[in-house]
């Protein structure tokens, strides 16, 4: 399946982490206010106000298939440009939400220099992993 649309696999993990991280990265008030207090700039933020699972469901059932179709159907090299935009956009957001979630979970609560430096380790590992996946996917794209 990766050979049919390798560019999709270059950003799919980033989208999943971004969408799920958006929900889990919401402040404590989000969960106690009936979903009224939230942090999200996406135009579909009203879905977060209805229910977090609705937000996840809509994002994954509409956005994932759309991005799959987008990089499959757009002509070369524009499809590569679209994949790069998705990698950069969702990559930035997924790292942001990942870090917010770790801080909210109390994994890195210290404000000293060592705690702040150590808080970068999970993000570095994550970035290395998703960039390797993207690299391998793009490599398959150029080989085909």
Language model features with spans:
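Hydrophobic alpha-helical segments at protein termini of multi-pass membrane proteins
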Residues: 1-144
